[in-house]
């Protein structure tokens, strides 16, 4: 099933947010409206209205969830996993970088990661507060703590908070529920090494507090089984130069 990134390509271009500028200030990227997107530290984030993609169409590689305001974790086949990570090998496991599809946007290659969130319908907001992507030449043998990932030969390839304490604001009510993607993260392929490396994605949700805490279900990262071709005109980076700067900066 083809993944539709947004309902209207023109609206996306008209509301595209350019956040790649001042890295010394914290960025709050608000994806709580229907056609919002933006850059943080070179990565492009876009809210997606993807519907359930069907068995085999996407590959879940980490589920994070708990009865707590803030949840965190990363993918690995090693057990035990971090306390808030789903232990099923179906949903939480090692991933080779060359399994993750790439997308070419205006001549630049990006790795594509799909995020599906779950919140109560009465309180649908959620913050993504940390996103760190690491690679290793060999698989992790222990994954019980974050230190198991960050220590040793792991290489940090992308950090949402590099140079600033940034966040992405999400809205569960904009999609049809669990199984519908909520956001796509495009991470520059130039940041990574060999495709034979193992890739590990750590994320934290709910840290903003207030209306943005975790309150239901799980958060899931996945990748699609095949290379992705965006719909014509949807992600035209050539339009960036004509856009106003719409970034909202946290003081």
Task: Give the positions of each predicted feature.
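Short, threonine-centered small-residue motifs that mark membrane-proximal processing/anchoring sites
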Residues: 3-5, 9-10, 14, 23-28, ...
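Hydrophobic membrane-targeting alpha-helices
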Residues: 17-23, 245
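Surface-exposed extracytoplasmic segments
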Residues: 27-228
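Residues that form or immediately flank small-molecule/cofactor binding pockets and catalytic motifs
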Residues: 138, 239-242
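C-terminal membrane-anchoring or membrane-association module
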Residues: 246-251
């Amino acid at each position: 099933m083809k993944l539709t990134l947004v309902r209207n390509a023109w609206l996306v271009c008209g509301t595209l947010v350019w956040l790649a500028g001042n890295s010394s200030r914290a960025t709050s990227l608000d994806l709580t409206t229907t056609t919002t997107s933006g850059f943080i530290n070179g990565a492009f984030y876009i809210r997606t209205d993807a519907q359930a993609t069907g068995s085999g169409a996407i590959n879940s590689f980490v589920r994070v969830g708990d009865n707590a305001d803030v949840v965190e974790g990363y993918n690995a086949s090693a057990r035990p996993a971090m306390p808030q990570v789903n232990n099923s090998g179906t949903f939480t496991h090692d991933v080779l970088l060359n399994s993750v599809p790439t997308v070419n946007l205006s001549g630049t290659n990006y790795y594509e990661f799909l995020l599906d969130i779950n919140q109560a319908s009465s309180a649908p907001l959620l913050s993504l507060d940390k996103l760190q992507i690491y690679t290793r030449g060999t698989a992790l043998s222990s994954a019980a703590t974050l230190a198991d990932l960050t220590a040793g030969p792991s290489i940090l390839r992308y950090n949402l908070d590099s140079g600033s304490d940034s966040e992405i604001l999400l809205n569960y009510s904009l999609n049809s529920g669990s199984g519908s993607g909520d956001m796509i993260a495009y991470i520059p392929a130039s940041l990574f090494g060999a495709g034979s490396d193992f890739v590990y994605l750590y994320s934290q949700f709910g840290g903003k507090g207030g209306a943005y805490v975790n309150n239901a279900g799980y958060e899931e990262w996945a990748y699609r089984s095949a290379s992705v071709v965006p719909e014509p005109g949807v992600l035209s980076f050539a339009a960036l130069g004509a856009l106003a700067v719409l970034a909202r900066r946290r003081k």
